[in-house]
Amino acid sequence: MPGWSCLVTGAGGFLGQRIVQLLMQEKDLEEIRVLDKFFRPETREQFFNLDTNIKVTVLEGDILDTQYLRKACQGISVVIHTAAVIDVTGVIPRQTILDVNLKGTQNLLEACIQASVPAFIFSSSVDVAGPNSYKEIILNGNEEEHHESIWSDPYPYSKKMAEKAVLAANGSMLKIGGTLHTCALRPMYIYGERSPFISNTIITALKNKNILGCTGKFSTANPVYVGNVAWAHILAARGLRDPKKSPNIQGEFYYISDDTPHQSYDDLNYTLSKEWGFCPDSSWSLPVPLLYWLAFMLETVSFLLSPIYRFIPPFNRHLVTLTGSTFTFSYKKAQRDLGYEPLVSWEEAKQKTSEWIGTLVEQHRETLDTKSQ
């Protein structure tokens, strides 16, 4: 395949950075453009100091700026779109999430058409499939079962509608000829080094005598390591550029999991952190049906107060369902069409993540030592 170029949106994020790292090893790749609204100084420096012959262009811009997006897409072969606002707690305003996740994706698709970018890979989420009820049990589900979220909460709704827009855009005519080919990847809950969710869990536990918060004791999930999700994006980029593989991938979506054991979110947090003296919360937990009812009451109060006060419930029905369900999916379709096999084993992923958690513990100790001086 001839030399090519790739634009990665959300490149300063947890997943985006890992995708860029793997792209550096791709043959015939001539340029990577990394786009985000804001890069931390250390991330920006990391991109500038990469030991590579590949041209790396750092772009800071808003995904809602259509003119900027069009310039960013000029001369690009593949767009990998990971930029998103992730919030299942209701803290971030609904319109902000819809603007970035849905409108931003629509803007980027239009920019690709105007700049004649032939391939578009969308980082979707398992949230677009559900779970819709904590009573529903999905074990090793697959794409043919056509699960679809019915939640109106902004994150699952915006990702679902954005994915629909991406897949509907497959086959669109490009401005100077040719066709846009798209696909979407639906990773499970992503863990690994620099996970913002795990980081928050650990930092909170460090302030609570190393007791891990209870976030999903009654769930059964199949978490996926960030390096394996990034690898799936690389394979999708290869596949859409390969004339033999591309027809099977165009307009398709894929669940991305790996060989991480099925477990609850609480068990995952404990397994990854127990080496550093963390322990699970042994206190009694409310059953899921009661939590769901309480969430409904809190949401009702929030709605009634909304004309005069913005009350954000500590949890909502979507979050209770998400963290109280059995909801797992197979990666067989990605294996068949993309040639996907997990790049990193569970044991290696566990070790890498645990070692990183150790650095968080050390940083916390150093902070306490500094304050005590």
Curated annotation (Swiss-Prot):
Keyword Mitochondrion belongs to the record: yes
Tissue spec. comment: Expressed in skin and testis.
Keyword set, alphabetical order: Endoplasmic reticulum, Isomerase, Membrane, Mitochondrion, Multifunctional enzyme, NAD, Oxidoreductase, Steroidogenesis, Transmembrane, Transmembrane helix
Catalytic activity annotation: a 3beta-hydroxy-Delta(5)-steroid + NAD(+) = a 3-oxo-Delta(5)-steroid + NADH + H(+); a 3-oxo-Delta(5)-steroid = a 3-oxo-Delta(4)-steroid
Database matches in InterPro entries: 3Beta_OHSteriod_DH/Estase (IPR002225), Lipid_A_modif_metabolic_enz (IPR050177), NAD(P)-bd_dom_sf (IPR036291)
Chief place of localization: endoplasmic reticulum
Residues that bind NAD(+): K159
Tagged with keyword Zinc: no
Active site (catalytic residues): Y155 (proton acceptor)
Gene Ontology process terms (BP): steroid biosynthetic process
GO cellular component, one term: endoplasmic reticulum membrane
Sequence intervals crossing the membrane: 288-308
Pathway this chain belongs to: Lipid metabolism; steroid biosynthesis
EC numbers: 1.1.1.-, 1.1.1.145, 5.3.3.1
Molecular function via GO: 3-beta-hydroxy-Delta5-steroid dehydrogenase (NAD+) activity; steroid Delta-isomerase activity
Entry membrane topology: Single-pass membrane protein
Function of the molecule: 3-beta-HSD is a bifunctional enzyme, that catalyzes the oxidative conversion of Delta(5)-ene-3-beta-hydroxy steroid, and the oxidative conversion of ketosteroids. The 3-beta-HSD enzymatic system plays a crucial role in the biosynthesis of all classes of hormonal steroids. May be involved in local production of progesterone.
Family note: Belongs to the 3-beta-HSD family.
PANTHER family registered for this protein in UniProt: BIFUNCTIONAL POLYMYXIN RESISTANCE PROTEIN ARNA (PTHR43245), SHORT CHAIN DEHYDROGENASE_REDUCTASE FAMILY 42E, MEMBER 2 (PTHR43245:SF51)
Name of this chain's protein: 3 beta-hydroxysteroid dehydrogenase/Delta 5-->4-isomerase type 6
